[in-house]
């Protein structure tokens, strides 16, 4: 058995560094979680342009945050958006695994199960996050920016394809549908409790604890 993991919102919660950065930069009383959700929507609208180098990282950061605030009838300046982005990146570089997720990787190591990470994103940013989560990166890391393909493209999943490979991710379309169409077994980490067709998904888990239990089951433990 081999297990590859998505990074963002699977091994850690994307919302956590956003929340901490907001608390440091802005004083406005607002539903921070809803603001974050809005920012993710606007991020996804133009993220492919960023990956294709049509826009800069700063332009992406300004766009997603200003648009999200605008939905709350609040205007912020480009400078405020960039100040937030700087603090946000700092918080992203100081993320950590939960205690149970640490157990997951301790178990995989002890049982000598091959594992790795497959993620979309820019190489430098993703490596920075992984270094924050793991003391030593002694496993394969596949990043879309480096290999030239991105989820849900079949080609990126074929890099890990094997009869006994499982892919763990929170994304329904880019992770589960993408991996499944490439012939890879899937574990959907549905921590948002989305209502979707799961008939083609091998396992659905809703917490770190459930993920650990499924992995033990797959390893006949």
Question: PLM ranges: what are they?
Answer:
Residues 1-41:
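Active-site neighborhood of HAD-like aspartate-dependent phosphohydrolases
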Residues 3, 122-221:
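Asp-based, Mg2+/Mn2+-dependent phosphohydrolase catalytic module
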Residues 18-23, 58-66, 123:
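An amphipathic alpha-helix signature
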Residues 28-39, 71-84, 136-138:
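Short, surface-exposed acidic
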Residues 45-85:
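A metal-dependent, Asp-based hydrolase signature
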Residues 58-59, 78, 86-116, 154:
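Short, acidic loop-to-helix structural element flanking the phosphoryl-transfer center
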